[in-house]
Curated annotation (Swiss-Prot):
Chain coiled-coil ranges: none
Annotated protein name in UniProt: Early transcription factor 82 kDa subunit
Species in which this protein is naturally found: Vaccinia virus (strain Tian Tan) (VACV)
InterPro entries assigned to the protein according to its UniProt record, in alphabetical order: Poxvirus_early-TF_lsu
Keywords of this entry: Activator, DNA-binding, Late protein, Transcription, Transcription regulation, Virion
C-alpha cells in the first residue's frame, strides 16, 4: 500500500479570530479534495481555495521549534500564540480542556508545554490544523513569544521537498504479535466496539462477556474461567485473536483492525499507553547503515549502532534493515510508524545510496561479533596473512593445515589464521549465528578442532547442512527458546520427569556432552507462535490442543481424559514451548529429539476415564466426556452474538471438602483456582443438586484423592 503524506493546515487569524490566511501545506502539487483537511476547510470554514504551499511541518518538532517555523512560514516578526481546536499545543489548562487565547479564563491553572508535536497532538499524522494569532490581538498578549527559526529545519525541509517526487512510499505494515496496552476502556466503550463489529458485518467472531465475582462466563457451548470481570474478544477471519480487553488492559494483535474500529466512535477512553512494535516492509530497499550529513536532532538521534535511530524524545526506537524497518513505540500514536518510515526513506534518498551486498570479510569492512573478540586471556579474533607456509596440507580449495596452524581463504582470496600468543585458541572455525542467518562464513579461533562441526563442513567442504541446527548448549529455564536452542525444565519438573535419566555435561559449562535420553524444553510448538495471556486463554488452548500444558507450578489437562494427547507443552513468558526428550552421542554434535514420556503426567489426572452417561433425552446424551447428539460429539461453534451471564455461581463447601485430600497431589499454591476451574465445570455439566452432591460426585468421580493415584 502506498503511504500518502497527509496535507496540513495553518490558519492565521486576526483580532476577532477571523481567518486572514489559510495555508494548505502539502508535498504534492495539488489539493486532495478527499482529505479530511479539505473537508474541514470547505464545510466548517467555508474556504474553497486556500493557499497551496509546497512545505511540510515536521511532526517531530518541539513547540518552541514549531513556533519559530510558523513565524518563518507566515513571515511574522511579532510575538505569537499557537493553538488548535482539536488538541492543546504550547498551553493547556490543568484539567486538559482545549485552550483558546481569545476566550481565556483565570479560573483554571494554565500550563506551558514544550513537548513534541506528535506527542501533544493526537492524530497529527492524519489531521493537523494549527491556528496562529499575534499575541497583541488576543486577550492574553503577555503569553505570546517570538522564536527564531532553526535554519537546519528549513534546510532539511527544502531537501525533503526536492527528493519527495522520487520517494517510493509503497510499504506494508504489520504489528508485532500480541501487543499489550493500558487504557481506561470500560463497559460503555467495549459495548460500542462490539456493536461496531456487528454493524460492519465483517464476519469477525466477537464476544463481550461479564463475569461475577467467581469469574464464570458462559457463551455458546463452552465455559471459560477468566481472571477478568469484563472482557471483550474479537477474532480474525482465520480464528486468530485480534484484540482482547478486560477494561484496563487491551491486548492488540491486529492494530489496524483496532484503529479502524475506534476511529470514529466515542469509546470514552484516554490515549492508550503501552509498547507496540511495527514491522514495515519496503518495496524498494534502503541502506540500513544510515549516516546523517546535517544536524537533524530535531528528527532523529543517531546511536553507536549505525542501523538504529532514536526519536528526539528517545521513546521511539527505529531499527533499519535493507528491506524492512522495525519501529518500537512507547505509546500508541495513530500511523506514527508510517510517518517515521516516510522520514527514513526520505533521509536515505537525501544522504545515503543503497550499497550492494558485500562480503563481511572484505579487508575494508572486517567485522566479527562480540563473541569473537580478543580479551585479556582469550585471543579469538583471527589475523590476516599474505601467504601459505611451505608444506601445508590442502584440506579443501579454501582450507589448509599444518602442525602449527590452520588457514581459511574466503571468496575474496583473503587468508585468515589463528596465532594465539598463549598457544590456546589456534583452531579455525566459524560463527554459527552468521552462517545460520545468511550463510556467511565468518572465521573465529577455538580451543579445539572444529572439523566435526556442521558449519565447518558447509564452509570448508561445501556440504549442505540442515537449516535448523540445534546448539548442544542447554540454557537455564526462563527465557524464550528459539529454534536453534533448548533449555532445562523448571527444577520441580526436571526432577519429576527426569527421575532415573541422566545428561552428561562438559565441565565448567552447560554444553551437552552425551545422553541416552533427557527431558528438555524446545522451541515453540508448531510453526506459529502461540501466546497465552490469561487463564481463560490457557484453558481454551488446552481443551482445543488436547495436550498437557505446564504453567509455572501448575499442570493443565484437557477437560476430557480421553482427549489427552501424547505431547507436553510448557509456557515460558506467555509463549507455548514443547517438552521433548533429547538424545546425543558423545562423538557427534547431532541431536535427536523424541516425544516426552507423557504418561508420567497423564497418570496424575484424577478424573474418571471411562465415558459414563449423565443424562439423555431424544437422542441427546450428556456424558463425562462431552455432549453427544445421535452418537456424534457436539463441538460446533455457536453464535458469539448472544451472551448468557451467570451470577453467584460458587463452589460449595461440600465439594471443596470432598476433594481436599486431592490437593496433596497438586503441584500448585493456587488451590482455589484449581478447584474452581475444575469443579465449576463439573457442577454445570451435571446440573448438580446440592442435596445429593456427595453421591453424585462419588458416582462419576470416585478418585477424589482418598485413594492413592498411580
Amino acid at each position: 500500500m502506498r503511504y500518502i503524506v497527509s496535507p496540513q493546515l495553518v490558519l492565521q487569524v486576526g483580532k476577532g479570530q477571523e481567518v486572514e490566511r489559510a495555508l494548505y501545506l502539502t508535498p504534492y502539487d495539488y489539493i486532495d479534495e478527499k482529505s479530511p483537511i479539505y473537508y474541514f476547510l470547505r464545510s466548517h470554514l467555508n474556504i474553497q481555495q486556500p493557499e497551496i504551499v509546497k512545505r511540510h511541518i515536521l511532526l517531530t518538532l518541539r513547540m518552541t521549534q514549531l513556533k519559530g517555523y510558523l513565524g518563518n512560514l507566515l513571515d511574522i516578526k511579532d510575538d505569537i500564540i499557537i493553538y488548535s481546536h482539536k488538541n492543546n499545543l504550547e498551553y493547556s489548562y490543568v484539567d486538559n480542556t482545549i485552550f483558546n487565547p481569545f476566550v481565556y479564563t483565570q479560573k483554571k491553572t494554565l500550563l506551558k508545554n514544550d513537548s513534541f508535536l506528535y506527542n501533544v497532538y493526537s492524530g497529527a499524522c492524519d489531521f493537523l490544523v494549527i491556528w496562529v494569532a499575534r499575541a497583541c490581538d488576543t486577550s492574553i498578549p503577555e503569553f505570546g513569544s517570538y522564536e527564531d527559526v532553526d535554519n537546519n529545519i528549513i534546510k532539511f525541509e527544502t531537501m525533503l521537498m526536492e527528493v519527495f517526487p522520487q520517494l517510493d512510499l509503497d510499504i506494508t505494515v504489520e504489528s508485532k504479535f500480541n501487543n499489550i496496552f493500558r487504557t481506561n476502556l470500560k463497559l460503555t466503550g467495549l459495548k460500542k466496539i462490539i456493536q461496531r463489529v456487528q454493524d460492519l458485518d465483517i464476519n469477525y467472531k466477537s464476544l463481550l462477556s461479564r463475569y461475577d465475582e467467581h469469574f464464570i462466563n458462559m457463551t455458546g457451548n463452552h465455559f471459560i474461567l477468566n481472571d477478568e470481570q469484563l472482557n471483550l474478544s474479537i477474532w480474525d477471519l482465520d480464528g486468530t485473536l485480534a484484540l482482547s480487553s478486560d477494561g484496563d488492559t487491551v491486548m492488540i494483535n491486529n492494530v489496524k483492525l483496532f484503529t479502524d474500529l475506534v476511529s470514529d466512535i466515542d469509546t470514552q477512553m484516554e490515549r492508550i499507553k503501552g509498547d507496540i512494535t511495527y514491522k514495515v516492509h519496503l518495496a524498494t530497499p534502503i541502506n540500513s547503515r544510515i549516516k546523517l550529513d546535517i544536524e537533524t536532532s530535531f528528527i532523529f538521534i543517531e546511536t553507536a549502532t549505525n542501523n538504529i535511530l532514536l526519536s528526539s524524545d528517545k521513546k521511539i526506537s527505529i531499527i533499519l534493515a535493507k528491506n524492512h524497518i522495525s519501529i518500537k513505540v512507547k505509546n500508541h500514536i495513530p500511523n506514527i510508524e508510517k510517518y517515521f518510515t516516510f522520514l527514513v526513506i526520505a533521509i536515505n534518498a537525501m544522504f545515503n545510496s543503497v550499497q550492494k551486498s558485500a562480503d563481511f570479510t572484505k579487508v575494508e569492512t572486517v567485522y566479527w561479533s562480540r563473541i569473537c573478540q580478543n580479551t585479556k586471556n582469550k585471543n579469538r579474533k583471527p589475523i590476516i596473512i599474505n601467504y601459505l607456509d611451505p608444506g601445508m596440507k590442502k584440506i579443501s580449495n579454501n582450507f589448509y593445515r599444518s602442525d602449527e596452524k590452520e588457514v581459511f581463504i574466503n571468496d575474496n582470496g583473503i587468508m585468515f589464521t589463528c596465532m594465539d600468543p598463549l598457544g590456546k585458541y589456534n583452531k579455525v572455525g566459524f560463527l554459527n549465528i552468521f552462517h545460520d542467518m545468511r550463510k556467511y562464513c565468518i572465521p573465529c579461533c577455538f580451543l579445539h578442532d572444529q572439523s566435526h562441526r556442521s558449519t565447518f563442513s558447509s564452509c570448508v567442504h561445501q556440504i549442505d547442512v540442515e537449516k535448523k541446527i540445534v546448539s548442544p548448549y542447554i540454557l537455564n529455564f526462563g527465557k524464550v527458546v528459539t529454534e536453534s536452542k533448548m533449555s532445562f525444565l523448571p527444577i520441580i519438573f526436571d526432577a519429576f520427569l527426569n527421575d532415573g535419566m541422566t545428561a552428561n555435561m562438559e565441565q565448567d559449562n552447560k554444553r551437552l556432552k552425551e545422553t541416552s535420553g533427557y527431558h528438555i524444553v524446545r522451541c515453540c510448538a508448531g510453526d506459529d507462535i502461540v501466546r497465552l495471556r490469561t487463564t481463560s486463554d490457557i484453558i481454551q488452548f488446552v481443551n482445543e490442543d488436547k495436550n498437557i500444558l505446564i504453567v509455572n507450578d501448575m499442570v493443565y489437562f484437557p477437560m476430557n481424559a480421553s482427549d489427552i494427547g501424547k505431547k507436553i507443552h510448557i509456557l515460558i513468558q506467555e509463549i507455548v514451548h514443547e517438552v521433548m526428550i533429547v538424545k546425543k552421542k558423545e562423538s557427534s554434535d547431532k541431536i535427536d529429539f523424541f516425544p516426552p514420556n507423557y504418561k508420567l503426567l497423564k497418570d496424575l489426572f484424577p478424573k474418571q476415564t471411562i465415558q459414563t452417561p449423565i443424562q439423555s433425552d431424544a437422542g441427546m446424551v450428556l456424558t463425562t466426556d462431552g455432549f453427544y447428539i445421535d452418537g456424534k460429539l457436539f463441538n460446533e461453534d455457536l453464535s458469539s452474538k448472544y451472551v448468557t451471564f451467570t451470577k453467584n455461581v460458587i463452589a460449595s463447601d461440600a465439594v471443596a471438602k470432598y476433594f481436599s485430600p486431592l490437593f496433596k497431589y497438586v503441584i500448585s499454591e493456587a488451590k482455589d483456582r484449581f478447584i474452581k476451574t475444575w469443579m465449576i465445570n463439573i457442577m454445570i455439566h451435571m446440573n448438580v443438586d446440592p442435596n445429593n452432591i456427595i453421591p453424585t460426585l462419588e458416582k462419576y468421580y470416585p478418585n477424589s484423592g482418598r485413594a492413592q493415584i498411580n
